[in-house]
A protein has these predicted regions:
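Donor nucleotide-sugar binding loop of glycosyltransferases
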Residues: 31-34, 60, 115
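A conserved acidic beta->alpha catalytic loop
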Residues: 57-66, 112
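Acceptor/aglycone-binding surface of glycosyltransferases and processive sugar-polymer synthases
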Residues: 81-99, 104, 116-198, 224-234, ...
Length: 379
């Protein structure tokens, strides 16, 4: 995956009694309340094994990274990677996995909702069988989802069914964030992974050029007792963006597709408002066009802010400033649209439909590029 950094280490590959067996990667954000408990629980589960715990923190404002460093000063098996300006579980896991010399790497949440006691069984399977991945599944017999509400269970089951149908992945729990993988395979696939959102397991299975050999073990998803949940509508949007990225990301960015869909909806909004103001309310055409443009522009901005750039969402005064930035970029894009289309039709004698499409494409590309840089720039 582009732009990923890694703390590269070297380790004797000879499998002796002192060889590093396993790395546990723990992506965190605001998990200071649970991090001590998690480290102790993993250590108890892996007693007798040679392992390291790599905690990858997305610059948590609650001081999670500082707490991890305090733990690491007393225990050399614990390491901290603090990421600045980058967010997301998938990217954090990839960076952590690339930072270890262990032949096998696992990912586990920092909130104690995954069952760390399953780790030895997962490790044994990978060490004794010709498999590449072992997945902790909530949907096998003896597994479970804890105290989830009926609505959340329904959404999860629907997402699982859609994923299996669309991607062909046969996992019982493709949304699982608890699994173990051979490091060599992860390093081989890393440059092609999207690194979007939470669903790194699904990303791996879609990206792999051949069918992954895997096993699944049941576990019961625990109720969160420490910290606050990160699950919200963003997770669903990340899921959609991941599927789009895997489907068309080699041609155009997934965000460009969403941006274009929003723009198409904007055309519908524009025509609706124009019809309402001009035809129904009896205002002149120019007034109707101005009203329709302002409403459609605001609609596009709001939808892009909520959907396309859910990971950089603006609020408060930044929303207002963003609207002005978006409106300016869109106005210039509209001028470019009209100018290109008119030139092609009038000067180059290009058919009117092709001229119009070319103008629209120029406008959309301009709007997407400029607003991504200035309106929703990464901070």
């Amino acid at each position: 995956m582009k732009g990923m950094s890694a703390l590269c280490t070297h380790h004797d590959a000879e499998l002796d009694a002192d060889a590093l067996e396993l790395a546990i990667v723990v992506p965190t954000f605001n998990e200071i309340e649970s991090i001590d408990v998690l480290v102790s629980a993993v250590q108890a589960a892996l007693e007798g094994h040679n392992y390291e715990i790599i905690i990858v923190d997305d610059d948590s404002p609650d001081g999670t990274a500082d707490r991890v460093r305090e733990i690491a000063r007393r225990d050399r098996r614990v390491h901290c990677i603090q990421r600045i300006g980058r967010r997301g579980l998938s990217g954090a896991f990839i960076e952590g996995a690339l930072a270890t010399a262990a032949p096998i790497v696992a990912v586990i949440d920092g909130d104690m909702q995954h069952d760390e006691m399953l780790l030895p069984a997962m490790l044994k399977i990978l060490r004794t069988r010709d498999l590449e991945v072992v997945v902790g599944s909530r949907y096998l017999e003896k597994g479970g989802v804890g105290n989830w509400t009926g609505g959340r269970i329904l959404v999860s089951q629907l997402a699982t069914a859609v994923t299996r149908r669309v991607t062909g992945v046969t996992l019982s729990d493709p949304m699982s964030g608890f699994f173990m993988i051979r490091s060599e395979m992860l390093r081989r696939l890393a440059p092609q992974l999207s690194g979007i959102g939470f669903k790194i397991l699904l990303d791996l299975f879609i990206t792999a050029p051949s069918v992954i050999r895997f096993a699944e073990l049941p576990y019961r998803f625990r109720a969160r007792s420490l910290g606050t949940s990160k699950m919200d509508a963003k997770v669903a949007l990340e899921f959609v963006e991941l599927l789009l990225d895997k489907a068309v990301g080699h041609i155009v960015p997934a965000k460009f597709v969403i941006f274009s869909v929003v723009g198409t909806l904007g055309v519908v909004v524009h025509l609706f408002v124009l019809t309402l103001v001009f035809k129904e309310w009896g205002f002149d055409f120019e007034s109707g066009q101005i009203a329709a443009t302002l409403v459609a522009m605001t609609s596009n901005f709001a939808l892009n802010n909520a959907l396309t750039y859910y990971d950089r969402r603006l609020s408060g005064w930044r929303w207002i400033n963003g609207w002005f930035s978006f409106a300016l970029a869109s106005s210039i894009g509209a001028i470019a649209n009209v100018g290109i289309a008119t030139y092609l039709f009038s000067v180059q004698e290009t058919p009117w439909l092709l001229s119009a499409v070319a103008g629209v494409l120029v406008g959309v590309v301009w709007n997407y590029t400029v607003t991504a840089i200035f309106t929703w720039r990464r901070t």
